[in-house]
A protein has these predicted regions:
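Conserved P-loop/Walker A NTP-binding site and adjacent catalytic elements of P-loop NTPases
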Residues: 15-16, 21-140
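N-terminal pre-P-loop "Q-motif" helix
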Residues: 2-19
Length: 149
């Protein structure tokens, strides 16, 4: 596996999430946020076998992210990593990482506000999501990790 800039902060991120419920990870495009973070956290003890749900703003990005994550594991989409987008879904009984779009997450929250069985919710590309805060002070109490290229 090729080394990416994000790799240097992953241990600190794992440690922080053992002690806190939230964190913000900032890194430039191509640093490895989408492809490395879910895989690095998959075996975290605090997840206790629960699912990681990663929100992507677009269907194409959700599918591509799932394909890349599955490829990194040497698997096909629908095994450990799957996706749910409008009119298409590839998940299975062993799926532990689900890449979803906003509409899918919204419907899931309406049906299950507590997100039963979900141990981690990742907002990828947070700045382009329609509900992202326009005021950065809203996120000021979150632990932020920065990665430089």
């Amino acid at each position: 596996m090729i080394s990416l800039p994000i790799d240097t902060v992953l241990p600190a991120l794992r440690q922080a999430l053992e002690n806190r419920d939230e964190a913000v990870l900032e890194a430039p495009p191509g640093a490895g946020k989408t492809t490395r973070v879910p895989l690095a956290l998959l075996d975290a003890p605090w997840l206790a076998g629960q699912t990681i749900v990663m929100l992507e703003p677009r269907r194409l990005a959700a599918r591509a992210a799932a394909e890349r994550l599955a490829s990194e594991l040497g698997e096909k989409v629908g095994e450990t990593v799957g996706y749910r987008i409008r009119l298409d879904s590839k998940v299975g009984p062993q799926t532990r990482i689900e890449v979803v779009t906003e509409g899918i997450l919204t419907r899931r929250l309406q049906a299950d506000p507590g997100l039963e069985g979900v141990g981690l919710l990742i907002f990828d590309e947070f700045h382009v999501l329609p509900f992202s805060p326009k005021n950065p002070e809203i996120l000021s109490n979150l632990r932020t990790f920065s990665c430089q290229n």
